[in-house]
């Protein structure tokens, strides 16, 4: 089985090198690795390009700089749909365990071919503090909830998707950051894909810093603004477009605005409301289709 790893990176050269090293030190090597670089600084891009050249079968792309979803689309569209069976999305601060790819192949090998085509497998990530992130379900309000049943969402940097899925669907580029993996999984479920929890797939998060570290508004951080804007967007899309239910949509909006107003008042940040709405881009859900077609990439360097 041919597995491609798509690495999205932004301003973290040291972590990128460690991420690539872990992938290529795997007991079973990836078929190919694609690095899509959203770094703004040309000098950092040059450093990252040189790092990539140290690893065989690794492609370097300059990123679109329109958010994590556009960056992931840029990476996955550089993989061959004819020459790739499964795709993993690995952030630059992730180090896979040496048996990650071997365990994924072993799990897929146990399935009939037709089941393989429609199965997404997801493992577990462990933070630098030892906290584990597990596959989950989405609550009515759009929060991730632990489950012992069939998951509805994946741990994105410890998951594998059939490559054919991205010939049908793409990451939603109207989500800048936050809940983008939940939205993608909702579309996969709607298209009859199944998500299978595979705890033997293990990865480690090696960074405690976010690329979104920046001043927020009042007592709400920049990261939280993006997360809550994305939760609003995904919640509306869930009940309006993906699984239409006017009553659930109305209930979701009522609860969201009531709870968010209380949260902002408690933080002394009620003035953040307009910025959350602006970042959510919910008006696009009433306009044209917002999922891009798969496009071939440019600016490719193969080491």
Short names for language-model regions:
Residues 143-161, 218-219:
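A recurrent flexible, glycine/aromatic-enriched loop bordering the glycosyltransferase active site
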Residues 22, 35-48, 94:
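A conserved acidic beta->alpha catalytic loop
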Residues 63-82:
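Glycine-rich, basic loop-to-helix element that forms the pyrophosphate-binding segment
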Residues 21-30:
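Short, acidic, metal-binding catalytic loop of nucleotide-sugar glycosyltransferases
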Residues 99-134:
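Conserved donor NDP-sugar-binding/catalytic core segment of glycosyltransferases
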Residues 31-40, 61-63:
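Short beta-strand/loop segment that forms part of the nucleotide-sugar
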């Amino acid at each position: 089985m041919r597995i491609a790893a798509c690495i999205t990176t932004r301003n973290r050269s040291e972590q990128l090198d460690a991420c690539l090293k872990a992938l290529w030190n795997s007991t079973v090597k990836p078929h190919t690795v694609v690095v899509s670089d959203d770094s703004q600084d040309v000098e950092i891009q040059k450093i990252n390009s040189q790092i990539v050249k140290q690893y065989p079968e690794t492609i370097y792309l300059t990123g679109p700089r329109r958010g994590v979803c556009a960056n992931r689309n840029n990476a996955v569209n550089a993989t061959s749909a004819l020459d790739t069976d499964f795709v993993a999305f690995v952030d630059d601060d992730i180090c896979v365990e040496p048996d990650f790819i071997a365990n994924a192949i072993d799990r897929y090998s146990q399935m009939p071919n037709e089941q393989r085509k429609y199965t997404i497998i997801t493992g577990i990530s462990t933070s630098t503090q030892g906290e584990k992130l597990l596959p989950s379900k989405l609550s009515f309000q759009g929060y991730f909830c632990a489950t012992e049943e069939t998951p509805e969402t994946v741990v994105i940097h410890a998951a594998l998707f059939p490559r054919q899925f991205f010939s049908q669907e793409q990451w939603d580029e109207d989500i800048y950051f936050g809940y983008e993996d939940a939205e993608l999984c909702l579309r996969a479920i709607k298209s009859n894909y199944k998500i299978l929890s595979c705890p033997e797939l293990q990865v480690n998060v090696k960074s405690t810093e976010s690329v979104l570290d920046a001043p927020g508004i009042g007592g709400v951080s920049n990261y939280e603004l993006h997360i809550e804007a994305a939760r609003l967007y995904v919640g509306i899309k869930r009940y309006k477009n993906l699984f239409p239910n006017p009553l659930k949509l109305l209930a979701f909006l009522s609860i969201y605005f009531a709870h968010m107003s209380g949260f902002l008042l408690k933080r002394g940040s009620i003035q953040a409301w307009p910025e959350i709405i602006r970042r959510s881009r919910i008006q696009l859900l009433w306009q044209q289709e917002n999922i891009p077609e798969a496009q071939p990439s440019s600016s490719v360097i193969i080491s």
